[in-house]
């Protein structure tokens, strides 16, 4: 059975790119969210094996969404994907409960390596 994924990013292009990388590697995309609030709501409904989460999104940012998900589901597996590769944000995302971090633009191989570490 394929591992399931929820993709959270406000940019359609990034959601489409991640979906292509992940479905090509045998993952099933259960849903997509454009805001942090949608991400939390969809996580509750879908409970995927993995979440990819952008940091900067309208409404509720990715780090706050990670905190909200981890508060309810401490074992959630979340991979941050953001253009903002600043050290402080990486540390904050990991402290919030994210398991790994990839910086955009990324190579498909780097995304898949991070996914394997997060699911490992």
Describe each PLM feature range.
Residues 8-9, 33, 51:
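Conserved sequence signature across two-component system core domains
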Residues 12-31:
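Two-component/phosphorelay signaling modules centered on CheY-like receiver
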Residues 35-38, 61-64:
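Acidic catalytic/metal-coordinating carboxylates
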Residues 46-52:
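Active-site beta3 strand of CheY-like receiver
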Residues 58, 86:
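The feature encodes the CheY-like receiver
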Residues 88, 106-115:
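C-terminal output helix
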């Amino acid at each position: 059975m394929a591992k399931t994924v929820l993709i959270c990013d406000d940019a359609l292009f990034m959601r489409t790119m991640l979906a292509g990388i992940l479905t090509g590697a045998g993952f099933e995309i259960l849903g997509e969210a454009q805001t942090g609030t949608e991400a939390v709501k969809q996580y509750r409904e879908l409970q995927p094996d993995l979440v990819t989460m952008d940091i900067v999104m309208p409404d509720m940012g990715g780090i706050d969404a990670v905190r909200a998900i981890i508060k309810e589901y401490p074992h959630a597996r979340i991979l941050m994907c953001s253009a903002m590769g600043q050290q402080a944000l990486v540390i904050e995302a990991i402290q919030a409960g994210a398991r790994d971090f990839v910086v955009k633009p990324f190579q498909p191989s780097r995304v898949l390596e991070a996914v394997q570490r997060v699911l490992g």
